[in-house]
């Protein structure tokens, strides 16, 4: 006699479980997670991304028969639900998603316990109502279930469909956000495009890779690096050593700034009139016109990383995302331990971007003023976040109340791709290159220059200018090689590979209290900032592992390596396997005498720096001048301006 049709078969129970977990995931996307979903494509991706892993995991249990199949599907569904809800609770408290590295930090686990009790919402039953119903059926209504096995020959079809759905999801995601998995900008981006379950798998794979690399490392590897970097160390310049002891340090990041803008006019108007003044040598600032960015795929995050650690970023991906839980001996922590500085970062975007909320803890940064500390009303936002003028104004107000001496890093945003600006903020006409990116870049750079001038004026009014080291720099290029045709129109010259390397100058301006300004033509890069600042405040650098050299030192190394292995010196540049003269950018027919030595040094620098990151070698370093940072003691709470926008 056949069983009644109303009974629930194993495959039907599987589909029901997949469907209800997916519904709960959608619910979390729109109610609990702030993912910044925009447009039709991103909403379609959001609809698609939970299915693949849920179905793949639960389909394994279709191989079982009878009661076992139902119970295994139920348990698998419960574990996925638990993972989802754990992320919901964690996100409510930390505005981020759970990772294996955060779970391994005792401080985070303890905070999580408090977060659960503090973060319950009245609607949380939604996450478990299906679990309760299924459990009741399995215990009390077993007669509703059809225990006949699901045909095993169809299980691989279900699995293959799940895998195909994942790759379709990934294709859509890569179309909307290229290099999603290689650059890993932000956990929110990964969850938005892949879903929380695939994100957990991705994080697990990366954690295993990192742990394997660390497991192979030893103190011997550290010794090799220390011996190498000690040979590179340069003696400080007595004229500058200790000149800024216990002075505030204000580090200003000019987003996507390139120095071809200095003294550049468009339609008869200066693009950067304020920076032009600072570059003249007649102001309080020393200008380094031959200062280059040294970033890789991590762009802005690489710039921050390099300048605070004197290490190179990774050859692929971002060190912030992939090596964020390493041990470091960073500039903020050294300043704190040696001279009692408090440190902070100020940024008009949310704290999870580039994994900053985790990385900064390992750098020993005390406070993080993210978007929740600023007025993020629509009038104040453009492109990726807060406009530079309101950002600088609010930041100066915060700085005027800070304990001194402080180390404060301000990260601007308006001069960021795609370089769009509200009409009321545009005060210079665009050029007419026919390329909206290049044309817009002129307007946003002009706005940035105005905002910077207003900020410096504010510092003077608040009594912070005279007693502060002020450092201004561009983080990376803004205009890529894809826009060479438009750049040729703008600059009136051909953009060759050699010329494009010249355009990687991003500028460095430094004001040291009590010192007159000028123009310093040394060739330098972001790697050199940390040793320079340590010497300026009078901290001996001999026991710190750094790859850069003091820019004021008479022994300063004028070879500037790039992350891809290219490099530039005072006389020539090595680009894509070819050597060009700096005078005219023409190919050299003979190798310079010091070329092989310099090339070998660049390769060794990159190799050694990579070994520090991949092996997490600082964990082995018993530095008499440094106490290891405990990331668990740092917590970056949201500011008074409220929660993140949905």
UniProtKB/Swiss-Prot annotation:
GO molecular function, one term: transferase activity
Biological pathway: Cell wall biogenesis; lipoteichoic acid biosynthesis
Any one of the GO BP annotations: cell wall organization
Site feature Cleavage, where: 217-218
Cytoplasmic topological segments: 1-7, 65-68, 141-153
Post-translational modification: Proteolytically cleaved.
Active site positions, chain numbering: 300
The protein, known as: Lipoteichoic acid synthase
